[in-house]
Each structure stands twice: as C-alpha cells, then as structure tokens.
Amino acid sequence: MAILVNKKTKVICQGFTGSQGTFHSEQAIAYGTKMVGGVTPGKGGKTHLDLPIYNTVHEAKAKTGANASVIYVPPPFAADSILEAIDAGIEIVVCITEGIPVLDMVRVKRALVGSRTRLIGPNCPGIITPDECKIGIMPGHIHRKGSIGIVSRSGTLTYEAVAQTTAVGLGQSTCVGIGGDPVNGTNFVDCIDMFLQDDETKAIIMIGEIGGDAEENAADFIKHSKIKKPIVSFIAGITAPPGKRMGHAGAIIAGGKGSAEDKLEALQSAGVTITRSPADIGKTMLDLLNG
C-alpha cells in the first residue's frame, strides 16, 4: 500500500522546461513515474520530453487529471508556485527548492489550512515509493521495494538509510524527505502517523537533526500512539556548537533548545531505538527486527 504516492499517481512538473525540471523529470520518467505534463508560463501548447506544456497548474490539472506536482522553481518565485498548486487543488505538492524566504513559507502554511493539499518540503529531496513512483531528486537505483518507512529532515542521510536498508535486504515501503527549513509542509508526526497505519510498513526509520522541536513532538506522538511499530532514529549534529547553523536553515540550536541530546533523550523515553552513527542505521534496524 505504501503512503502518499504509488504507481497510479499522476505527476506534473512546475518549472518543467528549466534545467533542473528537465533533468529530474527525465529521471522520474525513466524510473517509471507517471509524469503527465508540465507547467511553464508562456510555453503552453508546446511539448517537452514528449509531454504537453501548460501555462497554468489549473489547466494542467483539468487536461491531465494530475493529483501531484513537483516544483523546480527558483526561491523568489517558489512560494507562488506552491500557492498556485494549492489553489488548483493538487493533492500532493513536492517542493525541492532551497532558500525560500521564511515569510513566503508562512503565507504558504496559512494557505494550506483547510485546503486539500499536502505539501512535502520545501528544501527536500522529495518522496519515493520504490518501483512505483519517484517525485524528486533522490537516486532511484538505491531503492528496493520493502517494509521500512523512512522519514528524514536530511536528504543525503535519507539516501544513506535507504542504501543500508537495501543492503541488509529490508527495502523500503515509502521514503519521505520532509526538508530542512524552519517552516515546512509535512512534519515527522504526519509521516509517522501514516506509516503506523500502513499495513505494508513494518518498521520506521526517522532521521532528525538539531534545531526546532519536530523530533520532540514526534517522540511525544510515538509515546502516546496506540499503534506500535519498531522505530530507529538517528539525530545529526551531536557535536554542533550552540548558535551555529549547520547546513540547513532550520539546523540551529537557539535559546538553549534544539540540541541533539535533548532530542535523543525524548526519543529514547518514547521507546525509540537510537543509533549514534549514520553508518549503523541499517544494521540497527535489522538487529531490532530480528530481536
């Protein structure tokens, strides 16, 4: 069953004819994703990668029946692209763009309330259900269909968890990169809730990092959830000094909050198995499942 996307998901690309949109759409098509068109204002009526181009998301949705969109649009214009997709009623919107102004994302968060749209990202690698649907920039070949749900704030650490769970023979049900910005569309709790309710997902890997309280909120949710599944977590930034931003805009220990130790403590108290090395994620999960 997986979560959010599958082989029936119809995907359009906003920023379709740009270099990033072109490259990653080619990769998605080669993977088997059901790409049905793209949006580039002013180029409607033409074709690109043998798919139709539309001027607006409304038009693309009406003509193709798309229920998902991936956004490869520069930071100054990305929020408007998300808002257009929300307005068109696209169900899954994946925004890859890094560097969207925080106030722009606050506007987007407000527009999401009461809408039918779920936003993944921004500043994320995207979402993939192996062998079915790849939306984003992750390397498809490292994924294998399996039973581990992966949710992560970090792109490259997601790939590390994927490669390791593939190597030990577990595979993945769905992998979601929620992004490293302070304001995003989908959080750990949203994804863990879906994974807990998904029959195909037998266990969960959660990769967090310093900054914010998303991991603490997830720990609280896990602790009080009636459904229980094995969960392994790694938190990046254990050695990070307070006040220093570590890569992502949201990865900063500020006001004495958001340290790795706080997060690890909260997760451990919720019954989550912790690994302190990213190299041990797959092995830790395999050992946990083999009991």
From Swiss-Prot:
Positions of the catalytic residues: 248
GO biological process, one term: tricarboxylic acid cycle
Keyword DNA repair: no
Record's catalysed reaction(s): succinate + ATP + CoA = succinyl-CoA + ADP + phosphate; GTP + succinate + CoA = succinyl-CoA + GDP + phosphate
GO cellular component: succinate-CoA ligase complex (ADP-forming)
Binding of substrate, residues: 159
Enzyme Commission numbers on file: 6.2.1.5
KW Ligase (keyword) present: yes
Binding site for CoA: 17-20, 43, 96-98
GO molecular function, one term: nucleotide binding
InterPro entries in the record: Cit_synth/succinyl-CoA_lig_AS (IPR017440), Citrt_syn/SCS-alpha_CS (IPR033847), CoA-bd (IPR003781), CoA_lig_alpha (IPR005810), NAD(P)-bd_dom_sf (IPR036291), SUCC_ACL_C (IPR005811), Succinyl-CoA_synth-like (IPR016102)
One Pfam family named in its UniProt record: Ligase_CoA
Entry keyword set: Ligase, Nucleotide-binding, Tricarboxylic acid cycle
Pathways involved: Carbohydrate metabolism; tricarboxylic acid cycle; succinate from succinyl-CoA (ligase route): step 1/1
Subunit structure: Heterotetramer of two alpha and two beta subunits.
Family: Belongs to the succinate/malate CoA ligase alpha subunit family.
Primary role: Succinyl-CoA synthetase functions in the citric acid cycle (TCA), coupling the hydrolysis of succinyl-CoA to the synthesis of either ATP or GTP and thus represents the only step of substrate-level phosphorylation in the TCA. The alpha subunit of the enzyme binds the substrates coenzyme A and phosphate, while succinate binding and nucleotide specificity is provided by the beta subunit.
Name of protein: Succinate--CoA ligase [ADP-forming] subunit alpha
